Each structure stands twice: as C-alpha cells, then as structure tokens.
Amino acid sequence: MNKIVRTLGLTLFYITHDIASARYVSKKIYVLYRGTVVESGSTDDLIRYSAHPYTIALVLSSIGLSGLASETLGEKIFEATEQDQYPKCKFAPGCPLAVDRCFTEEPEKIDLGVGHYAKCHFAGDIYNYTRKIGIGNGLNMADLKLRVGR
C-alpha cells in the first residue's frame, strides 16, 4: 500500500483504533475522540511521546499493554455520553486527570513543537513526562497525576 501511495503521489486516510498498524502506513497521525482531534503529530513523536490521555490508552493497547491501559485510564473512557451532556473536554468523563476546569473550559490546542499538537489542559506536562519516561516503560498514572497538580 505504501508503495502505491508513494508512486502515485496519493494521500491516504487510514482510519483505525490500531496505532501499531497506523505506524506502518503513515508519517502523521491525527487522534480523534468523539469527532474532535485531540492530538496530532508525526507518527514517531506521537507514539513515543503521547500528550493526551486518550492517545496514551490507544498506544498502550496497541503495544500489547491493554491491561495497563485499562488500569491506567479505567474502562469508563469507552462509556457513551449523550452529545448534549458533554463537558468542554469530551474526554473528561473518562479521564483520570480530569479536574473541574476540564468540565467548564474547552482545552486549547497546545503546540508541543515539531508539529505535535494536543488538546488537553495538561498536554505540556504529559508530553514532558512521556518524553522522560516513555510509553510502555513504567508509565505511572499516579505519578503523572502528581506532576499535573492533582
């Protein structure tokens, strides 16, 4: 597929929950949650240094650490919420880092550098933490909560 895309100069939209497979067919990834882009960036940077809790869950699930993703973020991230009941951050009801602000203020798109963006009030702190620790290398949500002022 990559050869065809390169040869013909095409753009490919590959929609999946499997970040691992997306890694092989894309140079840039956009992560959507309930119709909103919550994170985007180069494939390598986004996978290695995720800055949004939902992206972290997807990455942990795709590298065979789905148990850690469930333990880290909880199963509630996949529960349905009525459209008119959404807080300002659509991920807030399932996010272990959510604070009152997440329910009352829509997060801005944060520029993390090198074309990497995330919509989370704590994106900078999360990004710095994942750059230090690395996804799958002992990611500890309790420690991350402390680092973002919880």
Residues of each region from the PLM?
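P-loop NTP-binding/switch modules centered on Walker-like glycine-rich loops
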Residues: M1-E71
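Charged, flexible cofactor/metal-binding loops and thiol motifs
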Residues: S42-G149
